[in-house]
């Protein structure tokens, strides 16, 4: 199966509240929003773990909503892994394999996914004889992903799969999830962690009290000041980039990004490697003329397009901060400034300015 489109229309009433959503996505579709927004309910309905009042579910041209859960071929990974404690790792994996229908694994391309390949990719081959109670949190999640994959799913539904892991364990698993996405396995991914969204998402669905506030590509959602204000202090644009070269004598790597060059601390990546970068709005300085001697490496010509008030959690009343959208040749940045700065600098749509960014402020999300 190719990286197929996902279509969801869902309505369900709970006592005192209602979830009513309609969205479509490509590749990895991330459901993002605060607690109580309806993310997990949507994931459970798609996976067939609850029966909503109304559901339309289409994955890769296949209508799945009329099928019972066991025939939808949807692999599910939860926050707490939910492995069978009385079975070994091998027993848990074999449980997933027994649920797989006959036929080819649905992934496309030259990405082999036999049982052995899955275990190698997830790094769980040495764990087969162990019981879940003896595994670390990261090991349990890798086994849970392997069990889901061995069921030969049409897609994966992942509900906060990394929420209980420390940062090091997250960094072990995120590249595996990106490889699965690149291999063509559609995902519905629930999270409230911006880094996970930035690393994995193709499309993002912003949820708020059971409704879709906005949906679209990661690049659009992350660089729209009207939407990114909801990310609070973590607002920032996510951009696709390619390693174009290195300057080891200066400790820098050159990235081709959004039609311009961005310098970051030296990366151990080959030229031509594709990756993503996240540039926090709080780390972007807006200038109307080029500064003199300065430690900043990145001085990028941009065009101011629009701005919105920055709604920050924990700040009451009218905020005096704003998110300004800045156009690059092939994308957009966000900058957090004060309203006073907008007036002082005469920032208005169409104004040519400079975006100043420290190289160490660019969050390189990896290949």
From Swiss-Prot:
InterPro entries: AAA+_ATPase (IPR003593), ABC_transporter-like_ATP-bd (IPR003439), ABC_transporter-like_CS (IPR017871), Mo/tungstate-bd_C_term_dom (IPR008995), ModC_ABC_ATP-bd (IPR011868), Molybdenum_import_ModC (IPR050334), Mop_domain (IPR004606), P-loop_NTPase (IPR027417)
EC assignment: 7.3.2.5
GO MF annotations in UniProt: ABC-type molybdate transporter activity; ATP binding; ATP hydrolysis activity
Bilayer topology: Peripheral membrane protein
Localisation: Cell inner membrane
Keyword Nucleotide-binding: yes
Keyword Cytoplasm: no
Keyword tags: ATP-binding, Cell inner membrane, Cell membrane, Membrane, Molybdenum, Nucleotide-binding, Translocase, Transport
Superkingdom of the source species: Bacteria
Top class in the EC scheme: translocase
Catalytic activity: molybdate(out) + ATP + H2O = molybdate(in) + ADP + phosphate + H(+)
Residue stretches making up the ABC transporter domain: 1-234
GO cellular component: plasma membrane
Residues covered by the Mop domain: 293-366
Residues involved in ATP binding: 33-40
Similarity section: Belongs to the ABC transporter superfamily. Molybdate importer (TC 3.A.1.8) family.
Assembly behavior: The complex is composed of two ATP-binding proteins (ModC), two transmembrane proteins (ModB) and a solute-binding protein (ModA).
Function, as annotated: Part of the ABC transporter complex ModABC involved in molybdenum import. Responsible for energy coupling to the transport system.
Protein's name according to its UniProt entry: Molybdenum import ATP-binding protein ModC
Native source organism of the sequence: Granulibacter bethesdensis (strain ATCC BAA-1260 / CGDNIH1)
Source species taxonomy: Bacteria, Pseudomonadati, Pseudomonadota, Alphaproteobacteria, Acetobacterales
